[in-house]
Amino acid sequence: MLVWLYWSENILDQYSQTNTLYINSIVYTEVSIGFNKIEELETAIEQLGIKVLEIPREALFLTGKVFLKYRKNTGTKKSPLPDFFIGAHATVSSFDLITRDITKFRTYFPQVRLIHPNLAER
């Protein structure tokens, strides 16, 4: 687990040297699990220079369409997966996406540039 922590810290630091870091409410929710107080999370976000963005309606619409494709591909979930909101937001905003879990993003959002730790694919 520490390997991923170090990778994440390193890539966020490197990427932020030349790019603005953005998260949306879905990522905010996922990250909040690691904090005891909202103030701690807000401080961390501020220190990292991360901007929190609303998910555009175009991305919400795309999320629904991708979810339908997922269901047609024998997906079993009853509502859109968090990664679908994240991938759709990256798609409509032309953002790069830093992630360790590339499978769903490659399948449903092939146009998004993924930044990931899989050295065999670099």
Regions flagged by a language model, labelled:
Residues 1-3, 30, 73-77:
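Short, flexible loop segments at the rims of nucleotide/cofactor-binding pockets, characterized by
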Residues 51-100:
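Active-site neighborhoods of divalent-metal-dependent phosphate/nucleic-acid chemistry enzymes
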Residues 29, 58-62, 120-122:
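A short acidic, often aromatic-flanked loop/helix-cap motif at beta-alpha or helix-coil junctions
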Residues 18-20, 49, 94, 111:
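A generic structural signal for alpha->beta connector loops
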